[in-house]
């Protein structure tokens, strides 16, 4: 295993920059019984390679919500790609900060229960922001503070524009047995239009 206290140091010493061929190199590994990719990003580009990951015979554990909330065609394509070769695509970390919510919802449905409603606080970021905001600190400063503390998505506009909650709702709805598309969820953005296309540096 890896000692938690040494993770940052080992990453600095041993990490290898992505030069584009990492997936082929992983697929070529023959000295291990199983290989696993951990996707802890919010990258759309990486989510678009999930089928390739399956085709390399690699398991995938993902906190990335993009594939699980993609259009139904791609979502089922990814599911089928892993199922066909007996590999796992595990994505419980996409909703609930690691709590077994996806698994619980799926287990209820598969045991014959009818899920009629799901309710909760679906954005820890927005919950924190509105708990803190009392007018004494500008809202944009609170957003910056939340980002610095790792409470937001890599780009906090994903929290503020509603897309992060939309993705979680789509994932949970699908786990509940609904056939739903992302554009079925009505989203109202809190991000002013003039800030939506700026770089992250310019946004802050």
Label each residue range with its predicted role.
Residues 83-86, 90-149, 163, 171:
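Rossmann-like NAD(P)H-binding beta-loop-alpha module
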